[in-house]
Amino acid sequence: HLGVRRQRQMCIRDRSYGSQRISFLSLVKNCNHKGLGIYYLLSAFIFGISGTLISVLIRIELYSSGNRIISPENQNFYNISITLHGFLMIFFLVMPGLFGGFGNYFVPIFQGSPEVVYPRVNNFSILILSLSYLFVILSLISEFGGGTGWTLYPPLSTSFMSLSPSSTAYLIFGLLMSGISSCLTSLNFWTTILNLRSYYLTLKTMPLFPWALLITGGMLLLTLPILSGALLMVLADLHSNTLFFDPIFGGDPIFYQHLFWFFGHPEVYILIIPAFGIISIIISSILQKIIFGNQSMIFAMSCISLLGSVV
């Protein structure tokens, strides 16, 4: 098959990165799935450190009454810390680490394929993720910061009186770019799992980990466009004088909550289902046995994803 042969040639060519001196250009050009998986894990670790430092600051501030770190002149910084901690831990630590990192490293191995279907798209996804992190951090130093909470509920996120509009815009841009990265990674996993399986590997005999990523990718592709639409409506209310969520002029702020939690509730299972697959790998490898009840576990994860998206 011409496509598989081309992927093998690209994979062999990119595996030579280990013998070369690592530079920024080599990081940008690398399309090897193992290298990108390691980059995802390292990026998630760095992003997680920043989120952890913010949580430490919150705990120090709450250690006793009164102001300990946050100055009385900038009380909004506490709300900014809560917002950034939620964004960094959910969208930049757990999702890139479990889904992008372990997925890129192990999915082609379990499928018996040399690479993912679209290596360049895979590389583009992690570059977008890094850029989205910069946008989120930029919101911290832009004007007074976006202290909206990680849910970005209107009217707080659309009000000029309580926050900085440019900071909220940076937060929204960061989330939109992170969503694009997750959607591209999900499409890559879906096409790899369904089209680049080995001849002897069927969906019934496929291990739990590829199944977990297949289900997780399906939830991301279903829910992230809804969240992106809601965020664009908030951005339009904030900068384009639209009135989607302004109750004074006939808007409905509850409508945003419906749109957000169509993503927010499946997000809980998007974070945990890849961990189910990773635990199955660990148990199977340590015991040198096939997981008992493989089909039942696949059915359970599918029902979890369906019910989580409907509720």
Predicted regions and their residues:
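Hydrophobic alpha-helical membrane-insertion segments
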Residues: S43-L53, S125-I141, I215-M233
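Membrane-embedded alpha-helical bundles that constitute the cytochrome b-like, heme-associated redox core
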Residues: Q9, S19, S23-F24, L53-N67, ...
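Membrane-interface helix-loop-helix modules in multi-pass inner-membrane proteins
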Residues: R59-W190, R197-Y200, V234, S240-F245, ...
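Single conserved hydrophobic/aromatic residue that forms the stacking wall/gate
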Residues: H1-R8, I12
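Membrane-interfacial alpha-helical segments at the cytosolic side of multi-pass membrane proteins
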Residues: F91-G103, S228, I270-I286
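Membrane-embedded translocation segments of transport machinery
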Residues: P247-P253, L259-V268, I272-V311
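Membrane-proximal N-terminal segments immediately preceding the first transmembrane helix
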Residues: R13-V28, V107
